[in-house]
Swiss-Prot record:
Annotated protein name in UniProt: UPF0166 protein SCO7045
Family per record: Belongs to the UPF0166 family.
InterPro entries assigned: N-reg_PII-like_a/b (IPR011322), N-reg_PII/ATP_PRibTrfase_C (IPR015867), UPF0166 (IPR003793)
Protein backbone atom coordinates (compact mmCIF):
# COMPACT_ATOMS: atom_id res chain seq x y z
CA UNK A 1 0.00 0.00 0.00
CA UNK A 2 1.23 3.48 -0.85
CA UNK A 3 2.04 5.61 2.19
CA UNK A 4 1.28 9.28 1.85
CA UNK A 5 1.55 11.94 4.54
CA UNK A 6 2.51 15.59 4.71
CA UNK A 7 2.92 17.84 1.68
CA UNK A 8 1.24 16.65 -1.49
CA UNK A 9 -0.17 17.98 -4.76
CA UNK A 10 -3.83 17.82 -5.77
CA UNK A 11 -4.59 17.47 -9.47
CA UNK A 12 -8.15 18.31 -10.52
CA UNK A 13 -9.36 17.70 -14.06
CA UNK A 14 -12.69 19.31 -14.95
CA UNK A 15 -14.44 17.77 -17.95
CA UNK A 16 -17.97 17.14 -19.16
CA UNK A 17 -19.82 13.98 -18.18
CA UNK A 18 -20.37 13.16 -21.86
CA UNK A 19 -16.70 13.58 -22.87
CA UNK A 20 -15.27 10.31 -24.16
CA UNK A 21 -11.98 8.67 -25.04
CA UNK A 22 -12.38 5.84 -27.58
CA UNK A 23 -16.07 5.34 -26.68
CA UNK A 24 -15.33 5.23 -22.92
CA UNK A 25 -16.14 8.03 -20.45
CA UNK A 26 -13.12 10.35 -20.28
CA UNK A 27 -13.29 10.57 -16.49
CA UNK A 28 -13.08 6.77 -16.29
CA UNK A 29 -10.07 6.66 -18.60
CA UNK A 30 -8.29 9.24 -16.44
CA UNK A 31 -8.97 7.19 -13.28
CA UNK A 32 -7.76 3.96 -14.89
CA UNK A 33 -4.59 5.63 -16.16
CA UNK A 34 -3.92 7.13 -12.73
CA UNK A 35 -4.32 3.66 -11.23
CA UNK A 36 -2.02 2.11 -13.83
CA UNK A 37 0.55 4.84 -13.12
CA UNK A 38 0.55 3.83 -9.45
CA UNK A 39 -0.84 7.09 -8.09
CA UNK A 40 -2.15 7.07 -4.52
CA UNK A 41 -5.80 7.47 -5.50
CA UNK A 42 -8.35 9.16 -7.72
CA UNK A 43 -12.00 10.12 -7.22
CA UNK A 44 -14.67 11.41 -9.59
CA UNK A 45 -17.18 14.02 -8.45
CA UNK A 46 -20.29 14.84 -10.49
CA UNK A 47 -21.44 18.43 -10.37
CA UNK A 48 -25.06 19.45 -10.03
CA UNK A 49 -24.59 22.69 -11.93
CA UNK A 50 -21.79 24.56 -13.66
CA UNK A 51 -20.32 26.13 -16.77
CA UNK A 52 -16.89 26.28 -18.32
CA UNK A 53 -15.12 27.71 -21.35
CA UNK A 54 -18.23 27.21 -23.51
CA UNK A 55 -20.24 29.49 -21.16
CA UNK A 56 -23.19 27.07 -21.35
CA UNK A 57 -24.73 26.40 -17.93
CA UNK A 58 -25.46 22.71 -17.31
CA UNK A 59 -27.77 21.80 -14.42
CA UNK A 60 -29.68 18.93 -12.79
CA UNK A 61 -32.54 21.17 -11.67
CA UNK A 62 -36.05 19.94 -12.37
CA UNK A 63 -37.45 21.02 -15.73
CA UNK A 64 -33.94 21.55 -17.07
CA UNK A 65 -31.97 19.26 -19.30
CA UNK A 66 -29.34 17.46 -17.27
CA UNK A 67 -27.00 16.79 -20.15
CA UNK A 68 -23.22 16.85 -19.98
CA UNK A 69 -22.94 17.80 -16.32
CA UNK A 70 -19.56 18.93 -15.01
CA UNK A 71 -17.30 16.20 -13.64
CA UNK A 72 -14.14 16.66 -11.57
CA UNK A 73 -11.47 13.97 -11.38
CA UNK A 74 -9.31 14.55 -8.30
CA UNK A 75 -5.94 12.90 -7.74
CA UNK A 76 -3.71 13.47 -4.69
CA UNK A 77 -0.12 12.22 -4.45
CA UNK A 78 3.40 13.55 -4.09
CA UNK A 79 4.30 16.48 -6.30
CA UNK A 80 6.79 14.38 -8.26
CA UNK A 81 4.27 11.64 -9.03
CA UNK A 82 1.46 14.04 -9.97
CA UNK A 83 3.71 16.11 -12.24
CA UNK A 84 4.96 12.89 -13.81
CA UNK A 85 1.35 12.00 -14.65
CA UNK A 86 0.60 15.31 -16.41
CA UNK A 87 2.06 14.29 -19.81
CA UNK A 88 -0.36 11.33 -19.87
CA UNK A 89 -3.25 13.82 -19.68
CA UNK A 90 -2.07 15.79 -22.72
CA UNK A 91 -3.53 13.31 -25.20
CA UNK A 92 -6.72 12.77 -23.18
CA UNK A 93 -7.86 16.26 -22.17
CA UNK A 94 -8.33 18.40 -25.27
CA UNK A 95 -11.15 20.46 -23.72
CA UNK A 96 -11.65 21.25 -20.07
CA UNK A 97 -9.63 22.64 -17.19
CA UNK A 98 -6.68 21.09 -15.35
CA UNK A 99 -5.53 22.62 -12.04
CA UNK A 100 -2.83 21.86 -9.48
CA UNK A 101 -3.05 22.83 -5.81
CA UNK A 102 -0.64 22.17 -2.96
CA UNK A 103 -2.28 20.32 -0.08
CA UNK A 104 -1.39 18.51 3.11
CA UNK A 105 -2.33 14.88 3.68
CA UNK A 106 -3.43 14.34 7.27
CA UNK A 107 -4.52 10.72 6.92
CA UNK A 108 -4.35 8.14 4.14
CA UNK A 109 -5.48 4.69 5.24
CA UNK A 110 -6.95 1.96 3.10
CA UNK A 111 -9.33 -0.76 4.21
CA UNK A 112 -7.70 -3.72 5.82
CA UNK A 113 -8.26 -7.09 4.11
CA UNK A 114 -10.87 -9.29 5.83
Amino acid sequence: MTRLTGSALRLTVYVGENDTWHHRPLYSEIVHRAHAAGLAGASVFRGVEGFGASSIVHTTRLLSLSEDLPVAVVVVDTEERVRGFLPLLDELVTEGLVTLDPCEVVRYEGRRPS
